[in-house]
From Swiss-Prot:
Modified residue annotations for Phosphothreonine: T502
InterPro entries, per database record: MKRN-like, Znf-CCCH_4, Znf_CCCH, Znf_CCCH_sf
The UniProt record lists the keyword Zinc-finger: yes
Zinc finger extent (C3H1-type): 41-67, 68-95
Residues the record lists as Phosphotyrosine modifications: Y344
Biological processes annotated in GO: mRNA metabolic process; protein polyubiquitination; protein ubiquitination
Alphabetized UniProt keyword annotations: Metal-binding, Phosphoprotein, Repeat, Zinc, Zinc-finger
Sequence ranges of Basic and acidic residues compositional bias: 10-21
Disulfide bonds: none
Chain segments carrying region Disordered: 1-37, 132-176, 526-547
SMART domains xrefs: ZnF_C3H1
GO cellular component: cytosol; nucleus
Name of the protein in its database record: Uncharacterized protein C1739.01
Length: 547
């Protein structure tokens, strides 16, 4: 009985079978009946298909469908050889929330990886056009700015540079407009918190770009100078002019006016355009007396007019006078202090009001050496200019005209008294003068040149000729015998019929060397009473006589 009972198989309870079926259905696919899992738990790994919206496993997916799950860092990304790129399920962010070598933050990389394919498509469309990283850190002032900033922030999250596009362009190079989700934007002009304003606030701005485009604020392009200084310059010039024409309009008109060619620095043209100090002072005083408001503006007259330094000797004198709002100076000091308003201000300084900003410089300065400008900016005195003319050619021509006219008119007066009274002239028409000044009185021995009457001769002082004496002084009919006698008295062109009476009384000769002969030995005594030469007009040049 017992054997038969053991041979008959026991029928299982149907309740137990139902419990086993329900237990199998709750376990994962790869989980055996004993409940021990043979694979790793992947619930901490986010599902990359779920992030792209293409996961078909649903609840049976072994990966996490939570966007807040913190992913581990991909070790291949740290090595730089991850083959999955933005499709990798692991995190491609450096530890410590630092920035990547290309300047992209880890938060941006995380958002790119979260967006997956959409981020890669947006990156391909936008190239490397990055938005300012300070966009999200700006504090908005009104709700409209907040609404505009959210759109710009979304665009920024999708347009950051990806390290997996090595052939993308640099941030500074962009091509026109880009399209994101059917919305037109302008690269590199998405606004920050300061410039995100409406179009009405940019009516008086000098920008030529619209301030908003399809709801996205656009910043104005950078100016040549700071916007504050440029607006101050425009407002100051508009106030002085009494109109709406600003500083830029003045500069454009000054380039096209009739004085444009006179602004080009040339040697003869600059000499010809220079005016005397007397005319300059009178014109400036007339300007300040008629309209004191225009005195603070850049002068539109010929640019050499404000220079009023009177050159009386080699060290130039500085003349500082205050006429209304004008501060007058001379020479290189005025050029260093006056703010420049156009490209010719370095060569020809103009008087500008101190109320204008000193950083307004829209053009480059002319590349002209200081030595040339110092020569060109040396003004002539009214007396020297009236006699010698305004240019070197005019000087020579005027002197030659005086010489030729003197031969026809005996009554023509000489230029200076020392010209006719000087004993240092020769038949070549040049004045021989001292090339150096002897300090102190000294004596030297020399052999007598020839016997003479009363043992006294006049000797030339040197062989250097002055510029203003290239043409000799006018010789009248009354002074012609005296000049001939003077030529005969010179030792170089001496004749035996010379007498000391012919050279007596012609002028003060105490500064010239006098030779007194005593028993075949002559002694030259030089007095130290020579006045300093006026070096403003006269320039010494070497003189060479032909055989």
């Amino acid at each position: 009985m017992s054997a038969a009972s053991s041979a008959i198989p026991k029928r299982s309870d149907p309740r137990l079978l139902d419990q086993k079926k329900s237990a199998k259905s709750t376990l994962p696919k790869n989980t055996p009946e004993n409940g021990v899992s043979t694979v790793k738990n992947l619930q901490h790994v986010p599902c990359k298909f779920f992030r792209n919206g293409t996961c078909t496993a649903g609840e049976n997916c072994p990966f996490s469908h939570s966007l807040e799950t913190e992913r581990p860092i991909c070790k291949y990304f740290l090595k730089g050889n991850c083959k999955f790129g933005p499709k990798c399920a692991l995190s491609h962010a450096l530890p410590g929330n630092t920035n990547l070598p290309n300047g992209t933050s880890t938060n941006t990389m995380a958002s790119m990886a979260a967006n997956g394919g959409a981020s890669s498509v947006a990156s391909k469309q936008m190239g490397a056009n990055q938005i300012s990283p300070s966009l999200s850190s700006k504090t908005m002032k009104n709700p409209a700015d907040k609404a505009n900033n959210t759109t710009a922030t979304d665009v920024r999250g999708n347009t950051a540079t990806s390290p997996y596009f090595p052939f993308s362009r640099s941030p500074g190079r962009h091509s026109g407009n880009s399209t994101i989700n059917g919305m037109m934007t302008t690269p590199n002009f998405l606004s920050s918190g300061v410039n995100s304003r409406s179009v009405d606030e940019f009516n008086n701005s000098s920008s030529g770009f619209p301030s908003s485009l399809n709801g996205i604020p656009i910043a104005s392009p950078p100016l040549a100078t700071s916007p504050t200084s440029f607006s101050l310059a425009s407002s100051a010039s508009s106030t002085n002019l009494g109109g709406s024409k600003g500083l830029l309009f003045q500069q454009m008109t000054s380039e096209n006016n009739r004085d444009y060619f006179s602004r080009r620095p040339t040697l003869l043209n600059t000499y010809g355009n220079r005016c005397s100090s007397t005319d300059t002072l009178s014109s400036l005083s007339r300007l300040t007396s008629q309209d004191p408001l225009k005195a603070s503006l850049p002068l539109q007259s010929p640019p050499l007019a404000p220079k009023t330094g009177v050159s009386l000797s080699r060290p130039r004198l500085t003349l500082d006078q205050s006429l209304g709002n004008l501060s007058l100076g001379s020479g290189i000091n005025q050029r260093r202090q006056v703010p420049r308003s156009n490209s010719y201000a370095g060569a020809f300084p103009s008087v500008v009001s101190a109320s204008l900003p000193t950083k307004v410089d829209l053009n480059h300065q002319m590349d002209v050496s200081d030595e040339e400008q110092r020569f060109l900016s040396t003004p002539l005195g009214s007396f020297d200019e009236s006699i010698l003319g305004s240019s070197p050619i005019n000087r020579l021509s005027s002197s030659f005209k005086q010489y030729t006219s003197s031969l026809k008119s005996p009554g023509l007066s000489t230029r200076t008294s020392s010209t006719m009274n000087s004993l240092n002239s020769s038949r070549f028409g040049a004045y021989f003068s001292k090339s150096r000044y002897v300090e102190g009185s000294g004596s030297m021995s020399t052999t007598p040149l020839a016997t003479s009457v009363n043992n006294s001769y006049k000797l030339p002082s040197g062989f250097s000729v002055r510029e203003e004496a290239v043409f000799s002084s006018p010789t009248t009919e009354g002074s012609r015998p005296v000049s001939l006698a003077r030529l005969k008295s010179e030792p170089i062109f001496r004749s035996d019929t010379a007498s000391p009476e012919t050279i007596a009384g012609l002028g003060d000769t105490k500064n010239d060397p006098v030779v007194s002969t005593n028993n075949s030995v002559s002694r030259i005594t030089v007095a130290n009473s020579s006045p300093p030469w006026n070096s403003t007009v006269e320039e010494e040049t070497p003189f060479q006589m032909d055989d």
